[in-house]
Amino acid sequence: MSAVELILLQRVENLGQMGDVVKVKPGYARNFLLPQGKAIRANALNRERFERERVQLEALNLKRREEAERLSERMHGLSVVLIRQAGDSGSLYGSVTTRDIAEAATAAGLTVARTQVILENPIKQLGLYDVRVALHPEVSIPVTVNVARSEEEAERQARGEEIGVEKEEPSGFVEEALEETVEAPAEA
């Protein structure tokens, strides 16, 4: 399978900066970079077009980045509360998704698409989590996600108090102290 050459129209994490000519697998180009408008094919016509439009693209990118930086200053320290059902051990019935976090952030005044929410690990327990929201490819802010069973529990978690989560006992084990010793038969 051969690689496809593309010109990046914006910074793409783990790939390159705007204007870089990169080689990627055809599926990555076809399914992500091209449809999202993050890159164009690197043929002679597109290279000329990109060089002509480079100044406008860089100016547009700079404007968007400045808007994202202003928004990040305004929204720094944002915290959202998600109320979910959970078992006694603190395990959620389901998990918190990027869509849930995006909707909660939008309700808190930060318009966010679910694709902008970056979850390092799935959220499947009650507690406080730091999640990154990418406002621009070069600007991201931390958002604290407070997952609790009720508003009162969320307030206690935010203050740093331990919530009443019972520890699960391993099933099938009964703790008994046996003082019986088994002696090996003496060999004659």
Curated annotation (Swiss-Prot):
Residues 149-170 have a biased composition (Basic and acidic residues). GO terms for molecular function: rRNA binding; structural constituent of ribosome. Residues 149-188 are annotated as: Disordered. Gene3D superfamilies: Ribosomal protein L9, C-terminal domain (3.10.430.100), Ribosomal protein L9, N-terminal domain (3.40.5.10). One of its GO terms (cellular component) is ribosome. One of its GO terms (biological process) is translation. Keywords: Ribonucleoprotein, Ribosomal protein, RNA-binding, rRNA-binding. Disulfide bonds: none annotated. It comes from the Bacteria. Pfam families: Ribosomal_L9_C, Ribosomal_L9_N. PANTHER family: 50S RIBOSOMAL PROTEIN L9. Belongs to the bacterial ribosomal protein bL9 family. NCBIfam families: L9. Binds to the 23S rRNA. This is Large ribosomal subunit protein bL9. It comes from Gluconacetobacter diazotrophicus (strain ATCC 49037 / DSM 5601 / CCUG 37298 / CIP 103539 / LMG 7603 / PAl5). The lineage of its organism: Bacteria, Pseudomonadati, Pseudomonadota, Alphaproteobacteria, Acetobacterales. The gene is rplI.
